[in-house]
């Protein structure tokens, strides 16, 4: 079983290696008004959907949330990014769970779409 640090490295490397995706890829964060957009934020969730900060061994069922932030009016670019995310995540063995959720982040005036992914860590 991989540690969370190994899973995080594997995910970041796969996302960063895709030349179609933006290079602004961050782990557990929230963009600010001065951040460069579009950007991707990824977080590992624990068994009940909360944030997991541990570097120890994780459960066999790993859940990742990917948040894509784009400027207002840039939904077409968001769709392209999300489709590329699907390709990357399927390639490294994750499957999409649930439907994407889309929000307006009023404090930074950006649109955010969250998707969740699951992988068996065996």
Each predicted region: which residue ranges?
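Small/polar-rich, solvent-exposed N-terminal microdomains that initiate assembly or binding
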Residues: 1-52, 107
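N-terminal short leaders/motifs
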Residues: 12-22, 61-74
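Oligomerization/assembly interface segments of phage tail-like spikes and tubes
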Residues: 58-72, 110-120
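Short, conserved charged micro-motifs
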Residues: 73-81
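Acidic-leaning, charged glycine-interspersed low-complexity segments
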Residues: 83-122
